[in-house]
C-alpha cells in the first residue's frame, strides 16, 4: 500500500498537468469547408514559412487595401485636467465598502474584452493542415487571387521575393472535403465564375498528399467534363493554358482555385520569379557552345598533327627503301 502523502502528491500533480494543458496547448484553427486563403509550400522550417507568409501578405494587403484596423476598438478616454492642476489630485478616495463595485467593474470590462476578441476578424490567420511542409493562411478577403497576382507581378518586375523559406504561394478560392461529390459541387460553383462567358483554354494541375482515395485520372476526367459543360468552346491546352485549375488534396481536404496565366508565372514559385532560370540557361548555353567550339578546334589541330606525322613516317620509309 502506498502512503497517503504520496497519493496526495500524485493527485496534485495530475491536477496540475490537466490545468497546464489549458495554458500551454492553445486551440488550433483547422481547415473548414468554404474557407479561402493562400496555400504555401516549403522544404524546411514551417514556422519561418508561416512568418514569411504573414509578412508578405500583410505588406501587399496594406498597399492594396490599406492597413488593417481591428473592429470595435475601444476609444481611449483622456482624463480632464482641472483648473488647479492634475485631475487625479482632487478626486475623492473610494470608500472602504466600494471594493465589490470595483470587482464588478473589472469583471464586466474583462468580459467585454473577451467578447471583442472573439468577434474580431483577422485579415490573415494560419490554419493547421496536418501535412508536412504545407501551410494554409486563411483570409477574410473576398478575392485572394487578386492579391496573389499583385504579389507575383511585383516580384517578377522587381526581382525581390522577400522570402527565404516560402517556395510557392498559391491563392485558393474555396476549400471542400476530399470526396468526389463535394469536389464537383464546389468546382461547379467556381467554374460558373470562370468558364461560362467566353471560350478559353485550360489545364488541370492535380497534386495529392496523404490521400490515395482521389485518383488522378478520375478527377481530371470529371473536372474536364464539367468545364466543357459550361462552354463547349473551352479546350484543353497543357503547355500554354490561359486558365489553370489548381487541385491540391491534403489528407481529407481539397483546395480549389482557377488562376489566369499560372504557367507563365512559373506556377507561382517565388524563387523562380525572382531569379528566372532562363538567364542561367542562356548563360550555360553560351559557355557550352564556347567549350564545344574550343574542343572542335583542338580536335582539328590534333587531326592535322597526326596527318603530318603520318606523312613524315611515309617519307622516312621511302628513304630507307632507297638506301637499301
Swiss-Prot record:
One of its GO terms (molecular function) is RNA binding. Residues 68-80, 277-291, 298-324 have a biased composition (Basic and acidic residues). The modification Phosphoserine is found at residue 100. It comes from the Eukaryota. Pfam families: THUMP (PF02926). SUPFAM superfamilies: THUMP domain-like. The modification Phosphothreonine is found at residue 99. Residues 1-24, 67-104, 275-324 are annotated as: Disordered. InterPro entries: THUMP_dom, THUMPD1-like. Coiled coil: none annotated. Belongs to the THUMPD1 family. This is THUMP domain-containing protein 1 homolog. It comes from Drosophila melanogaster (Fruit fly).
Amino acid at each position: 500500500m502506498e502512503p497517503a502523502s504520496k497519493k496526495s502528491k500524485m493527485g496534485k500533480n495530475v491536477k496540475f498537468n490537466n490545468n497546464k494543458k489549458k495554458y500551454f496547448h492553445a486551440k488550433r484553427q483547422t481547415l473548414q469547408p468554404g474557407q479561402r486563403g493562400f496555400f504555401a509550400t516549403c522544404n524546411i522550417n514551417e514556422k519561418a514559412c508561416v512568418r514569411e507568409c504573414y509578412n508578405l501578405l500583410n505588406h501587399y494587403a496594406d498597399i492594396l487595401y490599406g492597413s488593417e484596423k481591428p473592429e470595435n476598438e475601444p476609444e481611449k478616454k483622456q482624463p480632464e485636467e482641472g483648473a488647479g492642476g492634475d485631475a487625479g489630485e482632487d478626486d475623492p478616495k473610494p470608500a472602504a465598502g466600494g471594493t465589490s463595485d470595483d470587482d464588478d467593474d473589472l469583471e464586466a470590462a474583462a468580459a467585454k474584452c473577451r467578447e471583442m476578441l472573439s468577434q474580431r476578424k483577422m485579415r490573415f490567420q494560419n490554419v493547421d493542415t496536418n501535412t508536412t511542409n504545407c501551410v494554409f493562411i486563411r483570409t477574410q478577403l473576398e478575392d485572394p487571387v487578386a492579391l496573389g497576382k499583385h504579389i507575383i507581378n511585383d516580384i517578377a518586375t522587381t526581382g525581390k521575393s522577400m522570402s527565404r523559406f516560402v517556395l510557392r504561394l498559391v491563392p485558393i478560392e474555396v476549400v471542400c472535403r476530399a470526396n468526389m461529390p463535394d469536389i464537383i459541387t464546389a468546382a461547379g460553383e467556381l467554374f460558373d465564375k470562370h468558364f461560362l462567358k467566353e471560350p478559353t483554354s485550360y489545364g488541370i494541375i492535380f497534386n495529392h498528399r496523404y490521400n490515395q482515395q482521389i485518383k488522378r485520372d478520375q478527377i481530371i476526367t470529371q473536372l474536364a467534363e464539367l468545364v466543357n459543360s459550361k462552354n463547349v468552346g473551352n479546350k484543353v491546352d497543357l503547355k500554354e493554358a490561359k486558365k489553370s485549375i489548381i487541385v491540391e488534396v491534403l489528407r481529407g481536404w481539397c483546395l480549389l482555385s482557377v488562376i489566369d496565366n499560372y504557367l507563365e508565372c512559373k506556377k507561382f514559385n517565388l524563387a523562380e520569379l525572382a531569379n528566372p532560370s532562363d538567364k542561367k540557361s542562356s548563360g550555360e548555353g553560351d559557355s557550352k557552345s564556347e567549350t564545344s567550339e574550343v574542343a572542335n578546334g583542338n580536335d582539328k589541330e590534333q587531326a592535322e598533327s597526326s596527318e603530318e606525322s603520318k606523312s613524315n613516317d611515309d617519307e622516312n620509309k621511302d628513304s630507307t627503301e632507297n638506301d637499301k
